[in-house]
Amino acid sequence: MKYKKVIGNTPSGGDYSEIYYFDSNLNNVDEKVASKCIIREFKSDGTLVQETFGFCNKDNKLL
């Protein structure tokens, strides 16, 4: 599965996040062509803290 791992503090108190990118049919795609994303925030031990669904525009910014 394609995703981007971002190391650093997250808004919900996590230590890192993973961003998974999807097209309009929820197929996992490269971030450059994504229209939707799921952002998962984790503690350093892998415990899931928060999961957020978002819509991305052509510049991959949350709408």
Model-predicted segments: where are they?
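Glycine/tyrosine- and acidic-biased, solvent-exposed loop/turn segments at the edges of beta-strands
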Residues: 1-63
